[in-house]
Amino acid sequence: MTHIATWKGKEIAKSDRTLEVDGYVYFPRDSVRMDLLKPTPKTANDLKCPHGVQFYDVAEGTRTSQRAAWSYEAPQAKMKPVDHWIGFWEDVAIS
């Protein structure tokens, strides 16, 4: 099944190799418009995450959705299959 991530009417990810973990769909990086993702500074809560989470703002021009994407940079066992893959939430629609 092909999944598509859409943000403000723009397709930002598309793949038939997605994985679903804990209700979230994760996309391989090579299927994501990484030019629209801007890494955010790590918060104290981010640093407590056992999976080494990195959040991203989704941004283009003057439009930004803060921390609307993330990846696990050093995942523990359960999240290992989505190591460095991108998950979306907030106002990013997955179909």
Where are these regions (language model features)?
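Terminal leader/tail segments of proteins
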Residues: 1-95
